[in-house]
Swiss-Prot record:
Keywords: Viral genome ejection through host cell envelope, Viral penetration into host cytoplasm, Virus entry into host cell. The gene is 32. One of its GO terms (biological process) is symbiont entry into host cell. Component of the phage injection machinery. Required for injection of the phage DNA into the host. It comes from the Viruses. Belongs to the podoviruses gp7 family. The lineage of its organism: Viruses, Duplodnaviria, Heunggongvirae, Uroviricota, Caudoviricetes. This is Putative DNA transfer protein p32.
Length: 209
């Protein structure tokens, strides 16, 4: 029926908008949940990277490295290689060999420090990408939900402004009655009251379809 179908259409539009908002919210929550671990990685890594940019931070980090098992293993391997090379060339007691052995620790320390800064930088990049993804998802969510809320408002306004079925029927009946009465007043037509009644009935039916 024409009148009720308008109300139903507005209600369906509002319902569809509510469901779409629910889906948007669920999707946004899922994106936030998926990106949260990467955000947690980036924050601490940024602090560590900032610490390594200071002399005190570098000194503390290198001190820990020099007292670690990985450093001992790398240093022993480097000394063994240098001593074997010096023995093969007869330069075990040379100044050059001594300088090479003395340079092992600083070289290993600098290589390790550079690697640590690179690793922390990569983790910071992961966190930044996650933050950017969260910001983008949040903006999309706000835009989409805002549009859906506007649709809901328009649908609710249309439903509120649409006359009820009773008022449409009453208006149609009154219009039909007036038309029927006018016809009944014409000579040779159905009498005025009967014409009004029939016209009102036809107007009522017309308003419902």
């Amino acid at each position: 029926m024409g009148g009720s179908s308008g109300d139903n259409g507005a209600s369906e539009q509002a319902r569809a908008s509510r469901e779409a908002i629910g889906l948007q919210r669920a999707q946004w929550n899922q994106v936030m949940q998926n990106l949260a671990p990467y955000m947690k990685v980036g924050g601490p890594a940024l602090g560590e990277l900032q610490n390594l940019t200071t002399l005190d931070g570098q000194g503390q980090a290198l001190n820990q490295f020099y007292h670690s098992q990985p450093f001992n293993d790398l240093a022993n391997q480097a000394r063994y290689q240098h001593l074997n090379a010096a023995e093969a060339t007869g330069g075990l007691g040379s100044t050059a060999t001594g300088n090479q052995l003395a340079a092992i620790a600083p070289a290993l320390g600098q290589n390790w420090l550079s690697g640590q800064m690179q690793n922390y930088g990569n983790l910071v990049g992961i966190g930044m990408n996650a933050a950017s993804g969260q910001a983008s998802a949040g903006q999309n969510y706000a835009n989409n939900v805002g549009q859906l809320l506007q649709n809901m408002g328009a649908a609710n306004a249309a439903a509120a402004n649409s006359p009820s079925g009773f008022h449409r029927a009453l208006g149609g009946g009154m219009a039909g009655a007036l038309t029927g009465a006018s016809i009944g007043a014409m000579k040779g037509s159905i009498g005025g009251p009967w014409g009004a009644a029939i016209g009102g009935g036809l107007g009522l039916l017309g308003s419902l379809f």
